[in-house]
């Protein structure tokens, strides 16, 4: 595998399982996939949850979601989360680092654990975000706006569209995978401390096609 292909593989080929179990730091070095580096666990999600929406930006920000966690978890991870790994440039990871621990205690099993940086929750299912999303994030409402027809805890695909050249601001789109499903759009900006802030939010109107 060429170095170019390896780079593309690392940027776009990360699966949910790969992140929850491990990220390969040198796994592309072998010519026939029989040689390569070890795998190192970067993050794990709370009990009942699935990692979805893995998106690595050009600036090294790794967005991912904790989909459908157990509602028995302690807050905040009793609700589905759209979030990002802060405090680390994933495009410039060290050659080796201590892996994220395997969750063993009851407390650890109810958290997002990371090897590097910290998982920041940007928004969660049901958040109204200062009234910008009156029915709540992830909620699909009827065409006349009178009722919620589906309350989703399944944030899936993420896509980040930067509005600044350095990638420190933009729109984060998240598909809420359900029947019917929906899509949220969060306008976000990164502060000097590396943490993200929501400036505006909305659920996109897919009423004409009966949801996503």
Where are these regions (language model features)?
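C-terminal motif of bacterial Sec signal peptides marking the signal peptidase cleavage site
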Residues: 24-27
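N-terminal secretory signal peptides that target proteins for export/translocation
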Residues: 1-9
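Exposed regions on extracellular, virion, or secretory-pathway luminal proteins
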Residues: 13, 29-30
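Sec-dependent N-terminal signal peptides
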Residues: 10-20
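Sequence/structural signature of beta-propeller domains
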Residues: 30-212
